Amino acid sequence: MQNYQSHSIKVLKGLEGVRKRPGMYIGDTNVGGLHHMVYEVVDNAVDESMAGFCDTINITLTEEGSCIVEDNGRGIPVDIHPTEKIPACTVVLTILHAGGKFDNDTYKVSGGLHGVGVSVVNALSKRLIMTIKKEGQIYRQEFEKGIPISELEIIGKTKSAKESGTTIEFFPDESVMEVVEFQAGILQKRFKEMAYLNDGLKISFKEEKTQLQETYFYKDGLKQFVKDSAKKELLTPIIAFKSMDEETRTSIEVALAYADDYNENTLSFVNNIKTSEGGTHEAGFKMGLSKAILQYIDNNIKTKESRPISEDIKEGLIAVVSLKMSEPLFEGQTKSKLGSSYARALVSKLVYDKIHQFLEENPNEAKIIANKALLAAKAREASKKARELTRKKDNLSVGTLPGKLADCQSKDPLESEIFLVEGDSAGGSAKQGRDRVFQAILPLKGKILNVEKSHLSKILKSEEIKNMITAFGCGIQESFDIERLRYHKIIIMTDADVDGSHIQTLLMTFFYRYLRPLIEQGHVFIAQAPLYKYKKGKTEIYLKDSVALDHFLIEHGINSVDIEGIGKNDLMNLLKVARHYRYTLLELEKRYNLLEVLRFLIETKDALSLDMKVLEKSILEKLEGLNYQILRSFATEESLHLHAQTPKGLVEFNLDDNLFKDVLFEEAHYTYQKLMEYNLDFLENKDILAFLEEVENYAKKGANIQRYKGLGEMNPNDLWETTMHKENRSLIKLKIEDLEKTDAVFSLCMGDEVEPRRAFIQAHAKDVKQLDV
């Protein structure tokens, strides 16, 4: 075993500024920074694994709000540091830039200067507990806000002399961090990634609050990574290979396959850090791959079609490239792009040699890959011809713009905005209602093409898409230039119904797949047209949704109610809680039937703790009191099933754990408890929901409430005042928070594969709270 003692810890001082400027060290003090703290501690353990001294990492999110990271590595050194004269582990936890990562003999490869990380985590934690198992002893030390509050002390002996490792438990400091609640979903993705990239490393993750427990372990990690990343059927087997360059101490590992897909999905990593912007290693990979495949096509396939180029080779490619190197050079602070020049040549040569060998030894698979590239080249040429029809001249004259476009007078992109409007009738209202100086209108006829299911050559033949590209002025694909964008706000404006939502989704898919920089730079918005218009006498109010309508009715209805024993503000707040309670009950009724039984279960104290037979008796008495006819009833220890004839017809009711664990049931129960915090004596035993309805009816009396199905129902002035006027309107800016997750959702929901989409809908249908049919 490599000797890992205090002299391996190199020190660069200065922890004072971390709490003052945490963003400089962890990116931000929000969700991203919080989880970065976890990664820094876990990365230390993974570095031990890459050095060959650790094969198990356990991460636990505790109910108390802490994160525990435990590894079975060598354990941080506990002997006295030669220059600091305190235990080396204390140095690592309290001095910035102290760590074995600065010593090439200790860690041949590392994700970076992780000695920075663990001390920063300590500085940003209100409490941190370090436990070390080393040389038969168990050591422990506690810190608060980066400062030791105890000496390093021996608290026991290990079960065996060989047992070793480090455990760090930290509680994020809410006085520095804006967010201190960890999100399991974010962490799961990263830990799974780490397990893929490190064969034989077992990462166990547990969240005590939800009892979530998962273990990630892969023997052929990169091959599994490629398999799991495939959104469509693989056309080839997964090709995997690895190599070690002794001169530069660089390990290269690659896995790739081709799928029946138009999109490329290449992921690259350096020392387990995702290089989302690529770099020299990714460039070398694509260079070697293209060279091998193009050479094979030139030597083995005679064709009169266009010769493929590198871009064609990437169509349908799924690949993972992982490098582990001793001194990576990254471009920028984020380490998202590798700059080490020698990596390009190393990776390119390895990939060329291995792919060349594979193609020679596997003629059937070679033919599949070659034909896919040839088809991509053919489609590219067709796309090029179609693109010429949509390509914008240097200075767009009015004559070249789409005929349906009602352009604005301003030529300043910063103040100009374009509305993509569903249908000609709504387009007509929008054209009449707009501010012609800076607002342009482009009506879209029907539903645009689903670009997820179509090749670019077909996409660019779509009249609606051609009109959009021409109007925007920024081009598409290789001709894309965001500097030529004619409008800095592109606003999707559709009806507030199912078709409108579908058109929004189709447009978002198009922007995401082919004009993603417009989303990334904040140019794409969705207009929030009102769903309701309330008119009473000369009063006209527009309300964006049913929640806004209900709140409006409550606020105006209580003015007509003469109530003693509660103030108007308290009454208003109470009724808004009651309104939410009613909403959750009605949603539950859609799933389980018998609203009266649901209310009984929620509102009867200790009902959920009753024996099922006792519960059955109480429920039957309740229903019989309502003159419902019980046709069948059957109870076991864990469930109750009954059929009843009600005024609404024959209904079935099932009572079991599915109901009790339903998120909506829990929400309804919680909301009812909130209601009970109010003094309800003023109701004089009147039902709170009946009273809510009474208040709403006062506001509805003599009023006309119109629900808009389409923008075309609104006159130009209404549309201007509610949806287009800068002072009044509400816009949603499109953002991409997680590129991979977004990509997966678009592929799943908009792609060709029916079964995965059906499974997704079935899994999430119960979580839909509003469904417009």
Swiss-Prot record:
Compartments, record wording: Cytoplasm
Binding note for cofactor: Binds two Mg(2+) per subunit. The magnesium ions form salt bridges with both the protein and the DNA. Can also accept other divalent metal cations, such as Mn(2+) or Ca(2+).
Binding annotation for Mg(2+) 2: 495, 497
Major place of residence: cytoplasm
A Pfam family per the record: DNA_gyraseB
Keyword tags: ATP-binding, Cytoplasm, DNA-binding, Isomerase, Magnesium, Metal-binding, Nucleotide-binding, Topoisomerase
Enzyme Commission identifier(s): 5.6.2.2
Subunit structure: Heterotetramer, composed of two GyrA and two GyrB chains. In the heterotetramer, GyrA contains the active site tyrosine that forms a transient covalent intermediate with DNA, while GyrB binds cofactors and catalyzes ATP hydrolysis.
Job description of the protein: A type II topoisomerase that negatively supercoils closed circular double-stranded (ds) DNA in an ATP-dependent manner to modulate DNA topology and maintain chromosomes in an underwound state. Negative supercoiling favors strand separation, and DNA replication, transcription, recombination and repair, all of which involve strand separation. Also able to catalyze the interconversion of other topological isomers of dsDNA rings, including catenanes and knotted rings. Type II topoisomerases break and join 2 DNA strands simultaneously in an ATP-dependent manner.
Protein's recorded name: DNA gyrase subunit B
Organism: Helicobacter pylori (strain J99 / ATCC 700824) (Campylobacter pylori J99)
Lineage: Bacteria, Pseudomonadati, Campylobacterota, Epsilonproteobacteria, Campylobacterales
